[in-house]
């Protein structure tokens, strides 16, 4: 495990280019810090299919989490808004879709509903938001900032450990610095290693 994976902060920003094996490993390590069979895993994905996420999980972690929920945003499934299905890859994985990637209100509602469904079980809840770079293609920085301010607060209140992916090469310094201020920890992948800053 990397040092990043040992973070227990409520909200973590991962600054790394896409297609980095170190980023994928750290993402999975953050999602599987404890016994996976006692975890609720929420995966919000704009660009990756739930099946590819499940395959990565099985190859890296092995054991299925107690609850696995995907919110697949945009064209990753090409399904109707709000559809919930169970994937054949993992019997306990539920996939919900949101067809409009710019619908932050709808996304916030779906995330809140998942957290509410899990609030009474004793499992640890972890989340991955993949990625803010994709979200910023559909909404401006200030709108995303407001959305994340509410979302990170909601995660903190619910005791969720969440990490958010952002490609630093796709955004200017002002955008990155604006978003950094929302997170308890920022991990940046540079020269083959993670540099971590916490507040």
Predicted regions and their residues:
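Short acidic, S/G/P-rich loop/turn micro-motifs used as interaction or catalytic elements
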Residues: 19-23, 49-51, 77-78, 133-139, ...
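Short internal beta-strands
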Residues: 42-47, 70-73, 163-166
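Phosphate-binding/switch region of NTP-binding enzymes
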Residues: 165-199
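Substrate-engagement module of ASCE P-loop NTPases
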Residues: 146-170
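Structural motif
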Residues: 14, 126-129, 163
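Short, structured coil segments at secondary-structure junctions
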Residues: 37, 64, 181-183
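Glycine-rich P-loop/Walker A and Walker A-like loops and their local beta1-loop-alpha1 context
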Residues: 1-58
């Amino acid at each position: 495990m990397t040092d990043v994976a040992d973070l227990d902060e409520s909200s973590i920003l991962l600054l790394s280019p896409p297609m980095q094996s170190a980023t994928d490993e750290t993402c999975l390590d953050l999602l599987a810090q404890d016994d996976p069979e006692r975890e609720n895993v929420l995966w919000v994905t704009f660009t990756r299919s739930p099946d590819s996420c499940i395959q990565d999980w099985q190859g890296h972690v092995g054991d299925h989490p107690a609850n696995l929920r995907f919110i697949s945003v945009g064209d990753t499934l090409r399904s109707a808004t709000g559809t919930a299905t169970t994937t054949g890859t993992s019997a306990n994985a539920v996939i919900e879709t949101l067809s409009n990637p710019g619908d932050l209100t709808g996304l916030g509602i779906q995330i809140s509903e998942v957290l509410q469904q899990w609030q009474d079980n004793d499992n640890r809840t972890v989340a991955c938001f993949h990625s803010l770079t994709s979200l910023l293609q559909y909404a401006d920085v200030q709108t995303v900032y407001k959305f994340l301010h509410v979302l990170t607060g909601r995660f903190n209140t619910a005791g969720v450990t969440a990490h958010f992916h952002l490609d630093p090469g796709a955004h200017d310094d002002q955008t990155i610095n604006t978003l950094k201020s929302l997170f308890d920890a920022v991990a940046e992948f540079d020269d083959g290693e993670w540099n971590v800053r916490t507040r």
